[in-house]
Amino acid sequence: MLFTGDQCYEEEEWLLETGAQVVSDILKIGHHGGNRSTSARFLDAVRPKVAVTTTPAWVATMPMPAEVTAMLQARRIPYFRSWEYGTLTICSDGKRFRIVLK
């Protein structure tokens, strides 16, 4: 799982330029799924099987930017927002993973 925290476009570009291995099955979308995070280039480099957004209550009423959801949908990457599903638990045996919604 790749945790991006409050990472925005500039940090994504820096990370890619360093040659860091960013491929991950699960991507925690940067900056709570807000503007200026998760560029197409970064998403293509990570190649996640699923994306997760942790969204505090004060942001919950704002939709994730259309461009982010469009990129995820175009790549057929399922995404989960904590405010929609509540607690998101990711279970793994080191080879496979599953997301438990509560």
Residues covered by each model-derived region:
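Active-site-proximal loop/helix segments of hydrolase catalytic cores
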Residues: 1-64
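Binuclear metal-ion centers of metallo-dependent hydrolases, dominated by the metallo-beta-lactamase
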Residues: 50, 55-102
